[in-house]
């Protein structure tokens, strides 16, 4: 099956993408652009010559190739981003019938499909936060923003968490009430948000169109009257769909964030839970979300459409920032008023930074595992570990689940603190034992990072996140090249062990 990556790669040449094939199946490639093709492409735009048989045949052949390429590309998008994302890409990105599938169109359609499918590596995770927004197009179409905190990690569905923050005015706003502070209300779910973002007139036309198509399908086109034929042409656009209660709604742009701590992929429950080092603080976000809802009930908080603190976008951003978004990307407030577009852009920036750090962390893990493929490096690492009596068992999962006693948790924290001190002393001794001209650049960078970023049990989530990002990026840079010696490989493994200690302290910090 041809995938999206094949189209992206073929489009890089700048030529239009075509789909050919042989007995082995379809093949994506860049169209040939020789002298003959250039000549016919030029003649197809000359008024006096474009109707010549040869030119017309060439133009029709190109249109057919473009249509086939588009069909296969939309199918590939559907496989990767789902039918809704592929439909959106076709509706908004295909534009003209028979237009070439070039680099710009491929990039735009992939971007649109990603937008409707949702952005972020955390989408399949059991513990995640979803930032949703509907585009703002002015005061008449202000859009909306909301945020959902989900935790489906427990096997018992009754213990799952679904906290939705959606800030609305408690009454319909008039044209002169955009600056007024009025009573707010909060909606309890994404489905209600979707219904609220589609107008009554649009919903009526969608129902009439659906009914007309059903009648024409049942009775036959020739028995349909003019009104039914007209109504049947009104199809739902990308994002407009019926929910399970047969109500029309408009889907949002979605940005997914992971929660810090142990997590797993809902699609593969057989895989062991893994610790997510970079993410948002679920407990802190839940506390703030519930504070917001209590403020709405008590009257302490109000709604004001044009505001930097009291509209839907600012409230969604407030909860996002409570989870530690600013540990990854500094937040800059809007000049006059927050809006869903500005909020969406900030959410995307935070998501991109979090995903990049987690990908780098996973890459560091894989590369350090490869270092242990060497028997001599394994032996050196075993000797180093045994010298400190280091324990490989993490505190994190037991602490996060509340299954370890306070005494046991403290004992493990003390053990991790001793190991941090030992690794730090190892790098300090290494740094002091070499003169400037004999020091390896990678060793010097790692020693400096160890000195600045050694974790402790007193660190909060913000400090641990900052230290972890420095260590992961420093170690990641120097793992790109193979270590020149076993001793250099040992130092990289010691730095990797320090990242493991940060994970242990992070687990304790978020469980506190």
UniProtKB/Swiss-Prot annotation:
What is one term from the GO cellular component aspect held by the record? extracellular space
Cystines in this chain: none
Chief localization: secreted
Q: Which Pfam families match?
A: SicP-binding
As recorded in UniProt, coiled-coil segments are 347-377
Kindly state which keywords UniProt assigns to this record, in alphabetical order: Coiled coil, Secreted, Virulence
Instruction: State where the protein is found.
Output: Secreted
Q: Does the keyword field hold Phosphoprotein?
A: no
State the Gene3D superfamilies in the record: non globular Virulence effector SptP domain
Superkingdom per UniProt: Bacteria
Q: Which family does it belong to?
A: Belongs to the BopA/IcsB family.
Q: What job does the chain carry out?
A: Plays a role in mediating bacterial evasion from the host autophagic pathway.
Return the protein name: Effector protein BopA
Q: Which organism is it from?
A: Burkholderia mallei (strain ATCC 23344)
Q: Which gene encodes it?
A: bopA
